């Protein structure tokens, strides 16, 4: 066991929510702003700050309306969520090894609970850090450091697994080992490699080898 503590992002890392998120961004920007924004531009905002900051990139004056329309479209779609193939087997293995597991997400707690109501994953995690629980958001290190503090762990014995440049930035700033996953379907793997992640994996099973 290289790392006693393993932190995970949620969307695009544990759960296959990429298309749900992008379709919700498309719906909100089309409905509120009346224009189609390219998917690559929408995707670039996903995974970092809370949803209000993400929407601010598209229109400073209509953030509240964008968020409202996004959530109206997004929340019912959580009924269709699935975990990525192989993720639960990895979590079971880590649990059996006695590792401390946590989640660090840009989602608010209410939306996390919608996902956990469908997917039986919460039992594996000792802590879940959501967007309303920290003053700063990824790529700032505060969410990662908050999770470590709750777990009584330190950066030198921890890893952070995520699918976005924001995850890698937060992990690097916090001083933990960073693992970028290529299966998230939102951020191009080339962009993840450019972030300086300590390693990039292409399947959940590879986490057993690198961690």
Model feature map: region roles:
Residues 2-89, 93-97:
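N-terminal helical cap/lid subdomain that shapes the substrate entry/recognition surface
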Residues 5, 138-168:
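Conserved Lys-Pro-Asp/Glu-containing loop-to-beta segment of HAD-superfamily phosphomonoesterases
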Residues 14, 44, 83, 101, ...:
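Conserved SAM-binding loop
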Residues 30-32, 54-59, 80, 88, ...:
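Substrate-recognition/cap helix-loop segment adjacent to the acidic, metal-dependent catalytic center
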Residues 37-41, 123-127, 155-159:
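Short acidic capping loops at alpha-helix termini that bridge into adjacent secondary structure
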Residues 120-130, 191-211:
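Structural recognition of alpha->loop->beta junctions
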Residues 159-199:
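Acidic, Mg2+-coordinating phosphoryl-transfer loop and its flanking beta/alpha structural elements
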